[in-house]
């Protein structure tokens, strides 16, 4: 009876999420995990189903893998109360040892690409900054196709999540700076199909230390906290603080049996002389997951070392035919693209040549137009210059006439000045004579004054004597005589003083008149020079003109090319490593040391020591199984 019932009231609602789609199914209540898994694989067209599984969160909030042999409803799958739907995630449960040799279908590669990319971006898988940029360029190639300078726009990559947050946080770089470095790698990629680009992405990602490793916390007999890493080639033991470099490893061909009892996990090795490898987990649920992953990885490990089954051979043949067909189509596409690019280049050159000729013609027309404008400008300037010359000549004649007039006036002023100077000299001489005469008269006046004083004194004496004489009896006649003599002497003295004062007044008046006349003449003279200064400006003209100016052999070639792919990859890997080293050096100055995580520090130590994932595993496998078990127990 089919597991997919038709009764809606009894069916189970299931939603399965992949990285690029969501699927919804109705299952019969008795449907097993295998029924649901097969339905999902058929829906998405997946045949390499052994790598994948259905993951869910159980009723205890633990992440678990759906068991294929048990019914879905019996596996403690949490039922969403809002819509009664069982929710699962379709993830890769096991990883191949070599993606380029083992992954056959394009859909398988695509699912691995999406999951690994998401694990790197979410930092579940540690990736160095320079490798993150390279992987981001491949992710851009998958999303947008080969680089096309015509369609690419600056800022086109800013919207998507391309780099892990841990990478962007530890460097002081803007999104534009990161985009420029991703774009540089993107431009260097050869034109490839989407599946080829995804394969290149996975080839680089599988070299990362944490790729394909499922980590579980464990302890040894000394109760030392460690990490158990379940991988496609065996079991790795890691230090609690270092998930990158394993302390020791055991390959699946060295392990005979795996079992657990409660929290104790026992691994029996192929070498009977070596004691069992024992560790302890935190709870029973982790032990069940470890056992499930160990069984699945061990089966795939042994399967890879056996001849391919008919189904796988058929799948590989179909994939090879499909790849050859795509190679033929790609060759044809590349040839057509080159022809189209050549035609476009020729058309571009013709358009460029035509545009160049048009520019030259436009420039010639512009030059001709400017020449005509210049010619007109020169004519106009010539006319203006002639007018200015005429105006200048008129002004020169006017200035000449004015200068003659001023020269005559200057001569007249000189004559007046000469006459005035003569008058001033005469006046000075006259004043000098008057001064001398005045001094003489002042001396005479002083002399007369003294004589007057002496006369007054003599008069007093005479009066005294007269009074004495009058006492003798001739009083009346003597008084008359004395009075007449005094009046006559006073009149003579007043007349002499008036004669002396008059010349002094005349001299003062004459001097004032001369000074007034001289001042008027000097003022006129000064005004004359001011006028002459105001009208002595000239006219200059410094204006200057400015200048303006697939056949039968294709299948064989494709087959040989496919055989050389691996060798080409090894050759290209050296070039990629060199480019990664260059990028690491470029971004090193922008590093913020305090933002580095523990994994960043451990990775830097790996680089300095010259170690990588494969060299470390090779060293660990060089020791004997017994020595590795003893080393684990002593940790």
From Swiss-Prot:
Its main location: other. CDD domains: FERM_B-lobe, FERM_C_ERM, FERM_F1_ERM_like. GO terms for biological process: axis specification; cell-cell signaling; compound eye morphogenesis; compound eye photoreceptor cell differentiation; endocytic recycling; endocytosis; epithelial structure maintenance; hippo signaling. Pfam families: ERM_C, ERM_helical, FERM_C, FERM_M, FERM_N. One of its GO terms (cellular component) is subapical part of cell. One of its GO terms (molecular function) is actin binding. Gene3D superfamilies: 1.20.5.450, 1.20.80.10, 6.10.360.10, Phosphatidylinositol 3-kinase Catalytic Subunit, Chain A, domain 1, Pleckstrin-homology domain (PH domain)/Phosphotyrosine-binding domain (PTB). Residues 12-305 form the FERM domain. It is found in: Cell junction, Adherens junction; Cell membrane; Cytoplasm, Cytoskeleton; Apical cell membrane. Expressed predominantly in the germline. Expressed in the developing oocyte from stage 6 to the end of oogenesis and in the apical ends of follical cells from stage 10. Ubiquitous expression throughout embryogenesis with enhanced expression in mesoderm of early embryos and midgut of late embryos. In embryonic CNS, expression is seen in neuropil and developing brain and is enhanced in neuronal cell bodies. In embryonic PNS, expression is seen within the cell body. In third instar larvae, expression is uniform in the eye imaginal disk and is enhanced at the morphogenetic furrow. Keywords: Cell junction, Cell membrane, Cell projection, Cytoplasm, Cytoskeleton, Endocytosis, Membrane, Transcription, Transcription regulation. It is a peripheral membrane protein. The keyword Acyltransferase does not apply. The keyword Ion transport does not apply. Regulator of the Hippo/SWH (Sav/Wts/Hpo) signaling pathway, a signaling pathway that plays a pivotal role in organ size control and tumor suppression by restricting proliferation and promoting apoptosis. The core of this pathway is composed of a kinase cascade wherein Hippo (Hpo), in complex with its regulatory protein Salvador (Sav), phosphorylates and activates Warts (Wts) in complex with its regulatory protein Mats, which in turn phosphorylates and inactivates the Yorkie (Yki) oncoprotein. Mer acts synergistically along with Ex and Kibra to regulate the Hippo signaling pathway. PANTHER family: MERLIN/MOESIN/EZRIN/RADIXIN (PTHR23281). Interacts with Moe and arm at the adherens junction. Forms a complex with Kibra and Ex. Interacts (via FERM domain) with Sav (via FBM motif). Interacts with Schip1. This is Moesin/ezrin/radixin homolog 2. It comes from Drosophila melanogaster. The gene is Mer.
